[in-house]
Amino acid sequence: MKFNFWKGLWKPKSLTPTLSHRLYRRMYTPQPPLNREMTVLDRSKFTVSLNLALAKFPDPKYIAQFAKECKADILQLRSINHVQKTDDNGRAVLLRHDLDLEGGEDVASKVMSQLSPRGKELLTEAQADITKIVKDLDYDFWRADEIFYSVLPVTEKDEIPSGFSMVGHVAHLNLRSEWKDYDRLIGQVILDKNPRVKTVVNKVDSIDTKFRTFKMDVLAGEDNTEVEQHESGCRFQFDFAKVYWNSRLHTEHDRLVSLFRGEASSRERKQQERAKRENHEKSTETAVEPDNTPATAVCDVFAGVGPFAVPSGRTSLFVMANDLNPYSYEALEHNVKLNKVSEYVKCFNLDGAEYVQQSMKLLDEHRRTQPTINPVQVRKRKAGQPVVKQDIPNHYSHYVMNLPDSAIEFLWSFKGLYTTVDGLSQDTPLPHVHVHCFHKWEAGEEEPSKEETKAALLERVYKQIDVRLDPNEVGMHWVRKVSPKKDMFCISFELPKEVAWAPQVNKE
């Protein structure tokens, strides 16, 4: 294989598009001109004129055959159709973009010498007319990362800050300080290149430890952070600038809701099977209505706008949901109504520790005023299928604490949980507590093992509840990598009886 350098790149002389030739074509993908002095977007500076070969077929029937049998010879640039209409309403095919069209020799001969044998054969048979045209690739042609590589002072494309998360119509960036001079340009390009995006914002401060919100700067688009987000089959409406929402946690939301629903479904199936057996044994014309089954109660301590609570309510889980942020609480109540789960999700606006300490009392008060609820799925039941109403239970099966920066520091509030209401016995089932938390390590340190991480997290738990947990009885689920030296986990454990029945404590 012989190579020569053309426009700074090696080019195979082979007439057949081999693996090396295809590698070359990937290398010689057109790129916008460098504009490293630009800090304000000027869309006119990104036009590139590309010389292309156009093969006009007198008989259009050859076009489909040529495209099918000679794919390596046709143009394969995104958003450019290789079939073109000519001035006389005929049809022509653009040939691959890496053909060398420079030099004084005849264009047709030069092109034919670079095509595959089958391509040359078909073009000759069809008596195709080959000419050279100029195609302008303007700003609209380039992807966002190509524009950024053209403008930003980077040497590698993996350094480009092109990643963002979507929350409704808002693109959320977290730009490093080095891109401050380019932030408006970056925002405008993201707005231009993503049709779903109407607003681009950048995080300008660290997350507020009280409400988990952060200050944001609108870089491009509408100054509107009122969004609608769809997740887990639910609709969520909120002001992204005033509440906490992380789209990267949707898998974790689904995981825990599925866990809760799985346990509840198992219990409900057993109840329905028992009722079916009783009906069969009695053989009466009138079906025996099954006894009510206790609902599964979930306590969401840091509920936000409802990503755990609302999907849980849609699956007939009974949820007592709380958030301290008044804007989150307002959005939570709105989303509960929006998704028609008001019977299953009750909302509160309290401090997390105060809410945990009052949670059993709040549950008891609710079950006294509304002891029974109808399942959400009743409307979908089959004809003849018995209606299984649900009783509000006297205890929670699960507590969710999704405040990873400090949730562990709230665990002390579980002390004396079962001493706050009357009527509980030592046999009352204990809840499972699911605590989200961060674990980080210093620069220069090796990433800790799973065992080391769990030990460190359980030591933090011990300092709050004064009871050592058996590592083998504690689940630890890796949620996501927050930064190179920081991971997010969810640790799950059954609340020890010594904690639930301990004297209640108060911290100022």
Swiss-Prot record:
- Basic and acidic residues bias located where? 267-284
UniProt keywords (A-Z) are: Cytoplasm, Methyltransferase, Mitochondrion, Nucleus, S-adenosyl-L-methionine, Transferase, Transit peptide, tRNA processing
Q: Where does S-adenosyl-L-methionine bind?
A: 253, 323-324, 351-352, 402
Natural source organism: Yarrowia lipolytica (strain CLIB 122 / E 150)
Q: Under which EC number(s) is this enzyme classified?
A: 2.1.1.228
GO MF, any single term = tRNA methyltransferase activity
Originating gene: TRM5
- Family the entry assigns: Belongs to the class I-like SAM-binding methyltransferase superfamily. TRM5/TYW2 family.
So what does this one do? Specifically methylates the N1 position of guanosine-37 in various cytoplasmic and mitochondrial tRNAs. Methylation is not dependent on the nature of the nucleoside 5' of the target nucleoside. This is the first step in the biosynthesis of wybutosine (yW), a modified base adjacent to the anticodon of tRNAs and required for accurate decoding.
Query: What domain of life does the native source organism fall in?
Result: Eukaryota
Task: Indicate the secretion signal residues.
Answer: none
Subcellular localization, as worded in the UniProt entry: Mitochondrion matrix; Nucleus; Cytoplasm
| Record protein name field | tRNA (guanine(37)-N(1))-methyltransferase
